[in-house]
């Protein structure tokens, strides 16, 4: 799995000569040339079906998308993410199995950070912005805690930026 954050540096190596007069193939450059906190990170998307499933009823689904169905309270999908800095936006694509409001809670590092709400069976993306969390390896968990038996939550993928 991707760590989700990296410091990227560029090093030029010249072998057997001076660098005046231009480069003649002794250097290599990558797409990102700055490092540290000024690096631009384009985000990370994790498919829910690739996460670890938990709870009594959570299962993989293939319709309306390849993802996970969270059928009852404490059904979840989770994985470990390394965070190099402590604030991100979390976007979850999902839907309800019907017209009832499905609710999926976001936990990071064991702390509830917010709830995604899906009011219909058409897949949609919703974002919880500026989520603060711990650094290093943290469990990211999507879990149902407010099931009343009238809806199921379907989750497709989670994007972190």
PLM regions: where:
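Extracytoplasmic
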Residues: 1-161
